[in-house]
Amino acid sequence: MKALSKLKAEEGIWMTDVPVPELGHNDLLIKIRKTAICGTDVHIYNWDEWSQKTIPVPMVVGHEYVGEVVGIGQEVKGFMIGDRVSGEGHITCGHCRNCRGGRTHLCRNTIGVGVNRPGCFAEYLVIPAFNAFKIPDNISDDLASIFDPFGNAVHTALSFDLVGEDVLVSGAGPIGIMAAAVAKHVGARNVVITDVNEYRLELARKMGITRAVNVAKENLNDVMAELGMTEGFDVGLEMPGAPPAFRTMLDTMNHGGRIAMLGIPPSDMSIDWTKVIFKGLFIKGIYGREMFETWYKMAALIQSGLDLSPIITHRFSIDDFQKGFDAMRSGQSGKVILSWD
């Protein structure tokens, strides 16, 4: 079968021919319809420091997808041939304390699809049936293919009660924009998103965010005054792991504010800890998606009218995958979808 693989320890992704994966007793075989390119896939393409430490070569990459069940392991129940599914990209052990205690997303033995085991940039994918999520009929393939990153956004945004709150989102990448849209959809008062990339800030404006602020051109304190905010932001969603953005967030949070951190900052990032302490801030680290509460919330949000369609900006055939990676690497894109049909 055709697959996109990391073949060499250097920049690039290559189209390859690999065997169809074998179906285990507890697995599903999925025929891939559409995949989306994640920022993680771009890191792997660029072969940065994280990729060099993490990715075994060769490796079929990718973890954002929608497809059709074409094979069912003999121990599997609850699925039928033809079911349309996406799936949780974190394969968990099932026997550690967190898994057994119902906190599966915190499994200490997590293995990543397309990172530590073969991924979805292929005609077929095998995953444990436990990880598969049936897609409702009224959700399109395009939207289903981005459920993985949408789940990061939903997990981050819904970490705290947002109704009537003022929310600051740092970083207008696709996940940041989706998180901001979720916050607005569920009842936040003001949702402000910051970045220096005007293309992506314009995407945020199309999603109905209260204010999309280019911090290279506007002062965030002036924006807060314009919105009638006198005490700071109640909730902060930190998406890019950018030290200057996080410091600005600490400066503008209200006392008792809550921050959810999805972004991964440099290990040597310095901040003014007195602001965390004297403001009584609560900081929560976010990893992946809650299994599987986040997945049900994703479907419900879309079914209740949340429109994510503007975030999908580019679509290519899998044979034009290079154009897709070029678009993602340019910074002038939202989500990029590759069709395998």
UniProtKB/Swiss-Prot annotation:
Pathway this chain belongs to: Amino-acid degradation; L-threonine degradation via oxydo-reductase pathway; glycine from L-threonine: step 1/2
Enzyme kind, highest EC tier: oxidoreductase
Binding positions for NAD(+) per the UniProt entry: 175, 195, 200, 262-264, 286-287
Primary location class: cytoplasm
Alphabetic keyword roster: Cytoplasm, Metal-binding, NAD, Oxidoreductase, Zinc
Record GO biological process: L-threonine catabolic process to glycine
Cofactor(s) for this UniProt protein: Zn(2+)
UniProt remark on cofactor binding: Binds 2 Zn(2+) ions per subunit.
Superkingdom of origin: Bacteria
SUPFAM superfamilies (alphabetical): GroES-like, NAD(P)-binding Rossmann-fold domains
Gene3D superfamilies in the cross-refs: Medium-chain alcohol dehydrogenases, catalytic domain, NAD(P)-binding Rossmann-like Domain
Gene Ontology terms: cellular component: cytoplasm
GO molecular function: L-threonine 3-dehydrogenase activity; zinc ion binding
Entries under InterPro entries matching the protein: ADH-like_C, ADH-like_N, ADH_Zn_CS, GroES-like_sf, L-Threonine_3-DHase, NAD(P)-bd_dom_sf, PKS_ER, Zn_alcohol_dh
Pfam families for this protein: ADH_N, ADH_zinc_N
Subcellular location: Cytoplasm
Assigned EC number: 1.1.1.103
Catalyzed reactions per annotation: L-threonine + NAD(+) = (2S)-2-amino-3-oxobutanoate + NADH + H(+)
Function: Catalyzes the NAD(+)-dependent oxidation of L-threonine to 2-amino-3-ketobutyrate.
Assembly description: Homotetramer.
Protein name: L-threonine 3-dehydrogenase
Species classification: Bacteria, Pseudomonadati, Pseudomonadota, Gammaproteobacteria, Enterobacterales
Gene: tdh
